[in-house]
Amino acid sequence: MQFESLNENYIRTYDDIITKDLCDELISEFERNESQFDKQVLKDHRSFTQIALQQHSNWKPYADELQGVFNKCVWRYMQDCQVTDKMFPPQYAYEMYRMKRYEPNGVDEFHDHVDVGNHESAKRFLVFFLYLNEPQGGETDFPQRGISVIPKAGRLLMFPPMWTHLHAGRKVTGDTSKYIVGSYLHYI
């Protein structure tokens, strides 16, 4: 039996979707709101600090602005991947935006995983990772595909969250933390 690899991976990056100034503003707002921090630690799986943006009123203007930007990127992604209206859900919603900080402490990272692993997460169909700064290390790796996305302020990474897209958030190797905003599109 023969097969032909079509090499379509549905992984896309879009640079400069928000300004460096807005990236810096989001990072400053994060650091000013330590009382909103939610430390996520699961040994040998993940370690980072996050804020669920829509749970706090001070983040509403930022969440609204990001949603407008993300909406434009959905249509760009559909065009770039040749996804037609017949292939894409007519209605969808965003999962709560989470801003995450990965510190250069030798611990913070997100090991190899997929983002749909059970009935609850099965409503996810598209990943959004918006990088807010440019640390050393901290790449998002797709180990089975040999793809590594380097964090860059204002860069958006989009890809499917299913078993086909094993990925990892690698450790920061320099002195600067990595900051991202992440979300998913949901079937509704």
Language-model-detected regions and their locations in the chain:
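Fe(II)/2-oxoglutarate oxygenase catalytic core
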Residues: 1-156, 164-188
